[in-house]
Amino acid sequence: MTKVGGSDSKNTLYCSFCGKSQHEVRKLIAGPTVFICDECVELCMDIIREENKSSLVKSRDGIPTPREICKVLDDYVIGQPQAKRVLSVAVHNHYKRLNHATKHNDVELAKSNILLIGPTGSGKTLLAQTLARILDVPFTMADATTLTEAGYVGEDVENIILKLLQASDYNVERAQRGIVYIDEIDKISRKSDNPSITRDVSGEGVQQALLKIMEGTVASVPPQGGRKHPQQEFLQVDTTNILFICGGAFAGLEKIISTRGKTTSIGFAASVQAPDDRRTGEIFRKVEPEDLLKFGLIPEFVGRLPVIATLEDLDEEALKKILTEPKNALVKQYQRLFEMENTELTFQDEALNVVAKKAIERKTGARGLRSIMESILLDTMFDLPGLDSVEQVVIGPDVVEGKSRPLYIYAERNEKSGTSA
């Protein structure tokens, strides 16, 4: 235990690891001869988590097992068990295919690119970001909305492979074993069912440009980013063993799926179609390739994405877990902000239920949670820096619904302040 001279500090306890006093931390845990603060405990847990991530259980071939990959995804992403299983198996098979290519020449194992379909805020991008943390192969994420056909303002599709090269420190051999996630893939859908006489340079044109690199070709990649340096030497990258995962919200696809096979009629004898009350994620489970064609993807592009995984709408329980359970959960973030004002922020359990219900009503998934939390805490965060001795702020369900103000608990007088709206 760290000792500091002076009569005022004789009874003050200090963390034996970081040296902070009991007044500078939330908790100080006592051992036989030492003390450790909550911040050092959290730091130790982070170190252990990192060690666990880097030591995934290996199967007989030295490959991470699908179950272990899925378990790591569970630590960071709430819900979506089916999508996690699909991704875990795909990554496991990707490793196996790479090992097989170096040992056998009899049967060539083709890759199975993946299409992730799910409502906005359901966790598609977060799943990809989590995969990037735990994989031993190079991984990169690209945004389909920035891509255009070659010769037009925007990024060429070869820039995706350039990002993969950068992720592998320009080691071409490693880059050729990597995984690419292309986000917002639904934004490059064809603008109409019928081919247009004008060029669709950011839609169908991009799909056609992606065909060869997704299937497997030797791409010429400009190491300095392409169009501004026409004299540079190109790197040759074989994309045959690069796994492509595409994700998108596909807004409007649920209507195409719901109306598939239904005949339309008019007049007095027309049959009245009942509205589909199913949630978006539930409808997505019934998706067929023909629905994607109607949405605006070209047949050749759909054919290069043989594995389709759909994500569910997040229900109230899942949204509540997202608020509190992950390492960077929203409630923990705001609690840390309030700690900087020496104030403890507490959410009642029923208040979290109301927040989750509001997010479901907004139909923005987990992304809507931050907006709701900001509106709840705005006035409190505005007033708090100018108030003295506020020890605790309590948020109840009425506060979330806008019926009352947060409850302020003061340290010295132990007074409670909270007025109804």
Curated annotation (Swiss-Prot):
Q: Name one GO cellular component term.
A: HslUV protease complex
Asked whether the keyword ATP-binding is assigned, the reply is yes
Keywords, sorted A to Z: ATP-binding, Chaperone, Metal-binding, Nucleotide-binding, Zinc
Enumerate the InterPro entries for this protein: AAA+_ATPase, ATP-dep_Clp_protease_ClpX, ATPase_AAA_core, Clp_ATPase_C, Clp_protease_ATP-bd_su_ClpX, ClpX_bact, P-loop_NTPase, Znf_CppX_C4
A GO MF annotation of the entry reads:
ATP binding
- Which amino acids does the record list as binding ATP? P119, T120, G121, S122, G123, K124, T125, L126
Query: Superkingdom, according to UniProt?
Result: Bacteria
Coiled-coil-forming residues are: none
- The entry marks the following residues as binding Zn(2+), namely C15, C18, C37, C40
Output the Pfam families linked to this UniProt entry: AAA_2 (PF07724), ClpB_D2-small (PF10431), zf-C4_ClpX (PF06689)
Cite the ClpX-type ZB domain residue spans from the record: 3-56
An example GO biological process term is: cell division
Summarize the subunit comment: Component of the ClpX-ClpP complex. Forms a hexameric ring that, in the presence of ATP, binds to fourteen ClpP subunits assembled into a disk-like structure with a central cavity, resembling the structure of eukaryotic proteasomes.
What the record says about family reads: Belongs to the ClpX chaperone family.
Task: Check the record and name the PANTHER family matching this protein.
Answer: ATP-DEPENDENT CLP PROTEASE ATP-BINDING SUBUNIT CLPX-LIKE, MITOCHONDRIAL, ATP-DEPENDENT CLP PROTEASE ATP-BINDING SUBUNIT CLPX-LIKE, MITOCHONDRIAL-RELATED
Q: Relate the protein's function as given in its record.
A: ATP-dependent specificity component of the Clp protease. It directs the protease to specific substrates. Can perform chaperone functions in the absence of ClpP.
Quote the NCBIfam families the UniProt record gives.
clpX (TIGR00382), PRK05342.1 (NF003745)
What name does this protein carry?
A: ATP-dependent Clp protease ATP-binding subunit ClpX
Species annotation: Beijerinckia indica subsp. indica (strain ATCC 9039 / DSM 1715 / NCIMB 8712)
Q: Which gene encodes it?
A: clpX
